Structure formats: structure tokens, C-alpha cells
Amino acid sequence: MARRADPTPAVFVFGAGKLGTALARALRARGVATTLRAARKGLPRTIRADVVVLAVRDRDVGPVAERMRDAGVVPVRAVVVHVSGALDAEALAPLRGSCAGVAQMHPMISFASPDVVPGLARGNVHVQGDARAVARARALARRLGMTPRTFPGLDAVAYHAAAGLVANGAAALAAVGAELLARASVPRDVAPRMLGPLLRSVADNVEKLGFPRALTGPVRRGDVAGLEKHLATLLAKLPEAVPLYRAAAEAQLPLARAIGDAPAESFDAIARALGRPARDGG
């Protein structure tokens, strides 16, 4: 039996920053009636929506929820969700009793600019909270082409730190890589256009192959000579990047050992080149 299509809700997004604006644009592109309101304009007199999305800073989620409750602007039939990764649904507790339910709806996607809507298809959304709000949030995620997931007992701070480590860390590493490319005579305006596809290929490998198989490069191959050349070049051209390169290579070693494309002695040699004991144990 075919699965029934999720009904199209009306959505009100409060907060016109990077995430809120991009989310509103993505919803409209998929035929969802969406109202976007900047937080600096304050609350409207009334909200006509089935789903109210708070896309504000973490510290503002609770206070905004309290103001919405006190102003009585949320329809009793509506659900309210926030998009913070570090806060669970309890941040919206002030609104319980004045709406149909509250939930966390955090897209594990990087939103860097209100002018760029990132690819949402195949992305994941963590949803947690009251049953009715969770159901509507999951339906909204599916309409965006994303996969809704719920992890009972999730440590929200650790979850958010993991997302930040990958998303923010990758952007920072790419910036360092772009600087090294510039010092290797690649035009600065070209470097981002080279590194973007490279990062997408890494993302594809991570998604499709998982770990440790997503790893590539000299550490996986056990190529200590290649790694030492990299370190020497970095020391000459961009010495401030050496600690980053060493830390990244150290993180690769357990993956490379698990893959086993080279003898253990090769990985021991890499560990010594990085200034670490030959084995981490085992």
C-alpha cells in the first residue's frame, strides 16, 4: 500500500538569520506556504501557521518562548519547534499548554549565508519532543528531502560538538589549505573552487563508505616518505599549519591501521615521524 503524502502545513519562521532565511527559502521552493519574520521586528500580533519555527540564537529560545506564551500569538492547534542543536525540546517548555506541542528540529547541515541555500537532500534532522510536534517536524523534514531521526537519551551538547567539529573544523582546515595553495602559486580566487569539490568528494566517501574506508592519502598507504615531504614543505611555506597537519595525521592513524593497506611497521614509522609512540596499544 502506498504511503500517504504528508499534508502541506503553513509555516511561520521567526528569525531571519542564516538558518531561518535559508530554511524559509527551501520550504517555499517546495510549495510550503512560509512566512519569515526577523526577530528584531518583535512578535506579530498573531501567527497563522501550523508549524512555528524558532530560528534564533540559543540564548534567545527560552525568552522568545516566554514572550510568545505571554502574548498569546501561537494558535492552539500549532506546534512550535526550535532548530538549535545544543538545546532539547525543554527549552520551549513555557509554550506547553498554549500550543499542540513543542520539539527540537535540528538540521545537521551547515548554513553559512542567508544568500545560499545548502543542499538539503539526503541531509539528516534530529527531532525530539512532544509526540504531535515530533510528527509534524518529521513530516516537514521529509518535505525538504531530509531524513528525520530521533535518538532517545541523546547528549545534546556532545551531539552539537560533533557537528561543530566536522562542519566548522572542515571550513577552518579548508581555509588553511587555501592559504597553502596560494603559497604554491594557485590563485586565491581559484582555491575555494578547487577545495569545494574535494570536500564534497570526502563527504560522499564518508556517507557511502563509512569509517575507516572513507580515509585516503599517504597515512592510509603507510607512505612515511610522502608524509615527511609534506611536513618539510609545510615547515618551509606555512609553519603555523604544521600542528594542524600533525593532529590530522594522528587522527588518521587508527583508521589506517584498521584498513590495513600497509604493514604495521609502516604505520609505526609514521607514528615516529609524528613524534608519537610507535603503537597506541594493541
Which residues does each PLM region occupy?
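Short, well-ordered alpha-helices that flank and scaffold nucleotide-derived cofactor binding pockets
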Residues: 21, 25, 29, 66, ...
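Interdomain hinge/lid region at the active-site interface
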Residues: 204-265
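NAD(P)-dependent dehydrogenase/reductase Rossmann-like domain
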Residues: 256, 264-282
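Phosphate-coordination loops involved in phosphoryl transfer and adenosine-cofactor binding
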Residues: 8-10, 77, 122
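NAD(P)+-binding Rossmann beta1-loop-alpha1 motif at the extreme N-terminus of oxidoreductases
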Residues: 1-48
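Internal alpha-helical scaffold of NAD(P)-dependent oxidoreductase catalytic cores
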Residues: 23, 95, 101, 117-208
